[in-house]
Curated annotation (Swiss-Prot):
This is Cytochrome c-552. It catalyses: 6 Fe(III)-[cytochrome c] + NH4(+) + 2 H2O = 6 Fe(II)-[cytochrome c] + nitrite + 8 H(+). NCBIfam families: PRK11125.1. Residues 1-16 form the signal peptide. It is an enzyme of class 1 (oxidoreductase). Gene3D superfamilies: Butyryl-CoA Dehydrogenase, subunit A, domain 3, Flavocytochrome C3, Chain A. Belongs to the cytochrome c-552 family. Heme binds at residues 130, 133-134. It comes from Maridesulfovibrio salexigens (strain ATCC 14822 / DSM 2638 / NCIMB 8403 / VKM B-1763) (Desulfovibrio salexigens). Its cofactor is Ca(2+); heme c.
Amino acid sequence: MKKNTIILVGALIAIAFMTYMLLSINTRKTEQVLLNTTPVIKEKGVEARSDIWGKEYPRQYDTWKKTKDSNKIEDMVEKYPQLAILWAGYGFAKDYNAPRGHFNALQSNINTLRTGAPTGPNDGPMPMACWSCKSSDVPRIMERDGELQYFTGKWARMGSEIVNPIGCADCHNSQTSQLEISRPYLKRGLEASGRKLEDLTFQDMRSLACAQCHSEYYFKKTPYTDEAGNKQVAAVVTFPWAKGLAAENMEEYYNEYGFKDWTHGISKTPMLKAQHPGYEIFTTGIHFKRGLSCADCHMPYTQEGSVKFSDHQIQDPLNNIANSCLTCHRQSEEEFKQIVEEKLKRKDQLNVIAMNSLANAHLLAKKAWEVGATEAEMEKPINTIRSAQWLWDYSIASHGSFFHAPGETLRLLGVANNKAMQARLELQNILANHGVTDYEVPDFSTKEKAQKLAGVPFDKLVKEKMRFKKGMVVEWYDEAVKAGRLDKNWWKILPDNTAYPQN
């Protein structure tokens, strides 16, 4: 009897195990069938709503939603008050924060003091182009209206249309789900640099999907005639890659083009503002030269059951060292962190030195103008300041440059500081020629002091922004929900952090 019981129990266990294995195999077969079947997200056009994509790609969607977790605000002007001096007369002197996750991109764009407080669709300081890297609605509108039409007019014109943050449609085709370049200006930039679009590989695309936004650009005024026969001018995002992707190549391009982003509010220098040349500086680093892509480190593959997929919580790889870094590097996590921290310390040290040199140069130039320096006297130091600040800005504007290309980053900071020091010496000589030998620049050691010197009416800007957020922005989202462009529960999950008090 006991022997029969043992046999029966053993048989039941074996049957249960075989049943489990059969179900597991069938489940994995079902998963593989689903994986090998590419869904059509939208028959025609661009599906900008990532939650619609999430119905077919739940794993990718769930990890993408985690990008909202990086919602902490780091006020870079508070951290580095020199920035208000360096960008005097330009929007970044008002407000500049460290980057956050893609989920937060659209709200950051609306909240920043740089975009102002429009009272209607045709006013405000910024053009339509300032939405271009913030929303998956951008390729939808470009396809529907045309690229030139999209780039025409003020930023506030499309507030109720551009309501979905960076998401699936920015990088993937809505019919095939394949990686694609959704911004035509990147295609033009690649062709200008000598790349053939037909030669791009899948591995290329795993970086170029990012390069659509993480690149240097300027707004090129482009005249055209609309369908109604009216003359229009579009401010088209343009990549200055015709002479190459290096900082000096772009500087040469801008100089030949006679381009300036703005005239400096303190030194009167015709300035260049680097945007976020992450891709360009990445191409000078060891990871790119070894064949790695952005996605290899920022979107490492992960496993769920039999399904292998890219983690769409795009973030600092140091938050996921085991999957992002230690697949190639052989250090422990702690040792690897220490190596990266050393690289960052070196960059930070040179960065502060360069910023201080540049801030002093701008303030010395202001004094030189005040005591009667001529344009002929000022031409050389002003041009030196322009070049120095461009190289400095290019080296740090993408934030991750110290890791992507540490050698190039340190080189650029060194050259920038050297040029800034040259400008300071030239300006000291000019001041001496005008009888000023003991001038000390004013204190810019805090955000408040630096913004005052830069002429930033901070409290006024915040008051205007809050009026805008409580009025026009609410109207934008209400209209978007009614039109079906946005889920009505959006407000419940949307982080709304700012570097300024929201009273």
